[in-house]
Amino acid sequence: MSESLRIIFAGTPDFAARHLDALLSSGHNVVGVFTQPDRPAGRGKKLMPSPVKVLAEEKGLPVFQPVSLRPQENQQLVADLQADVMVVVAYGLILPKAVLEMPRLGCINVHGSLLPRWRGAAPIQRSLWAGDAETGVTIMQMDVGLDTGDMLYKLSCPITAEDTSGTLYDKLAELGPQGLITTLKQLADGTAKPEVQDETLVTYAEKLSKEEARIDWSLSAAQLERCIRAFNPWPMSWLEIEGQPVKVWKASVIDTATNAAPGTILEANKQGIQVATGDGILNLLSLQPAGKKAMSAQDLLNSRREWFVPGNRLV
């Protein structure tokens, strides 16, 4: 194989842990792992380690959990490891310029989109919501900007009509490690060919919010159906009925024109709950009332038919 590189890995969630696992199987030398501090989780708010920390400790790797990499003493932790390259995957902390320049080959990042499209925090969800035909991963050389560095390697995959953010996440978690290992080989061999991003093609993937996931019936049925898939499994699209939030897990588009005001319930039967939108009809198929499990529209109608009387409007 190519030269074995001394690698610092920086990442936090499961998506990152899958990349670390691939690195550990690749023959490279992971000399240290940076991940975010343990966070309170669950009902008991017990401090929980990140998936990356769990894997790193299982493999006996040195783990560092600074709150920030701005203090000089924390930057020294990076310098002391004398790495050839730092691999960053969904780490969640900003790397100052001094840290970016410490490894011999700099720092590289695995980003969940085909840059320069969808720079930012939520590329998977934004690509789905926008109706993109494909997405993928980009391995890039990091600089001080937000996902602005030169691109080293790309892998793409189609977005299907059934994909959710959850299924795309899994697809990219398979693609990312493949691209990462190939990029590291090219860096070690000196065959990498950095490509400058075309600034005229840039779009931004802003962070998601729960309020943004509230269904806006003035949008088209096609947009709302994509939104429901984009926000699954988090934060989940939702609507409000009698002051209660009801999550929507699945819906379909009925390509029929209607003059009814957006949000008007047109039909409620075993085929679903059909609601007028700004353009077309959205058929709600799977919903989850507060405190309940997700259920089919038919099961919800059996217990809450009064919520979905044809002619009433959802707001």
From Swiss-Prot:
It catalyses: L-methionyl-tRNA(fMet) + (6R)-10-formyltetrahydrofolate = N-formyl-L-methionyl-tRNA(fMet) + (6S)-5,6,7,8-tetrahydrofolate + H(+). Its EC number is 2.1.2.9. InterPro entries: Fmt, Formyl_trans_C, Formyl_trans_C_sf, Formyl_transf_N, Formyl_transf_N_sf, Formyl_transferase-like_C_sf, GART_AS, Met-tRNA-FMT_C. (6S)-5,6,7,8-tetrahydrofolate binds at S113, L114, L115, P116. Disulfide bonds: none annotated. The keyword Transferase applies. It holds the Pfam family Formyl_trans_N. Keywords: Protein biosynthesis, Transferase. GO terms for molecular function: methionyl-tRNA formyltransferase activity. GO terms for cellular component: cytosol. It is an enzyme of class 2 (transferase). Attaches a formyl group to the free amino group of methionyl-tRNA(fMet). The formyl group appears to play a dual role in the initiator identity of N-formylmethionyl-tRNA by promoting its recognition by IF2 and preventing the misappropriation of this tRNA by the elongation apparatus. Belongs to the Fmt family. This is Methionyl-tRNA formyltransferase. It comes from Escherichia coli (strain 55989 / EAEC). The lineage of its organism: Bacteria, Pseudomonadati, Pseudomonadota, Gammaproteobacteria, Enterobacterales.
